[in-house]
């Protein structure tokens, strides 16, 4: 064993004159992501959460996916913003667990 500049022991095979064991010539990084929601359909209109809600589908000439956003409650349930807004006009609770509704976040 040899000792490096900081006083740590290093194997003698890793001394400066030895050839490298391998060299990284190319590295392809891959990243994955996922939503923090279990169900990917809006429980109010039953459309996929990333598709237009039924209100936006009815007005498809003027609606875009940027206008049809997703809203999460503090209970972590997600709905189309238009759907949950319409629901909250009559009841101030989550449609799935009946807890008082508070927005956690909304957007894409």
From Swiss-Prot:
Family classification: Belongs to the RING-box family.
Quaternary structure annotation from Swiss-Prot or TrEMBL: Component of SCF E3 ubiquitin-protein ligase complexes consisting of Skpa, Cul1, Roc1a and an F-box protein. In larvae neuroblast self renewal and asymmetric division, as well as ddaC dendrite and mushroom body axon pruning, the complex contains the F-box protein slmb (SCF-slmb). Interacts directly with Cul1 and Slmb. In caspase activation during sperm differentiation, the complex contains the F-box protein ntc.
Cell compartments where the protein resides: Cytoplasm; Nucleus
Assigned keywords, A-Z: Cytoplasm, Developmental protein, Metal-binding, Nucleus, Ubl conjugation pathway, Zinc, Zinc-finger
Effect upon mutating residue 68 to R: Loss of function
Residues binding Zn(2+) 2, per UniProt: 53, 56, 68, 82
Pfam families with a match to the protein in the record: zf-rbx1 (PF12678)
GO molecular function per UniProt: cullin family protein binding; NEDD8 ligase activity; ubiquitin protein ligase activity; ubiquitin-protein transferase activity; zinc ion binding
Protein name per Swiss-Prot or TrEMBL: RING-box protein 1A
Disrupted-gene phenotype: Severe pruning defect in ddaC neurons. Also shows defects in ddaD and ddaE neuron pruning and in ddaF apoptosis. RNAi-mediated knockdown results in apical detachment of scolopidial cells in Johnston's organ.
Pathway: Protein modification; protein ubiquitination
Species of origin: Drosophila melanogaster
Alphabetized CDD domains for the sequence: mRING-H2-C3H2C2D_RBX1
Chain intervals annotated as zinc finger (RING-type): 53-98
Origin superkingdom: Eukaryota
Protein residues bound to Zn(2+) 3: 75, 77, 94, 97
Entry function: Core component of multiple SCF (SKP1-CUL1-F-box protein) E3 ubiquitin-protein ligase complexes which mediate the ubiquitination of proteins involved in cell cycle progression, signal transduction and transcription. Through the RING-type zinc finger, seems to recruit the E2 ubiquitination enzyme to the complex and brings it into close proximity to the substrate. Required for the specific SCF-dependent proteolysis of CI, but not that of ARM, suggesting that it also participates in the selection of substrates inside the SCF complex.
Main subcellular location: cytoplasm
Gene that this polypeptide is encoded by: Roc1a
């Amino acid at each position: 064993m040899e000792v490096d500049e900081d006083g740590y022991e290093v194997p003698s095979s890793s001394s400066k004159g030895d050839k490298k064991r391998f060299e990284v010539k190319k590295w392809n990084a891959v990243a994955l992501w996922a939503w923090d929601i279990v169900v990917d359909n809006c429980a109010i209109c039953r459309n996929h959460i990333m598709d237009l809600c039924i209100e936006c589908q009815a007005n498809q000439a003027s609606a875009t996916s940027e206008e049809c956003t997703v809203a999460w409650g503090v209970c972590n349930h997600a709905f189309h913003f238009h759907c949950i807004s319409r629901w909250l006009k009559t009841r101030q609770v989550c449609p799935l667990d009946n807890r008082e509704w508070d927005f956690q976040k909304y957007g894409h």
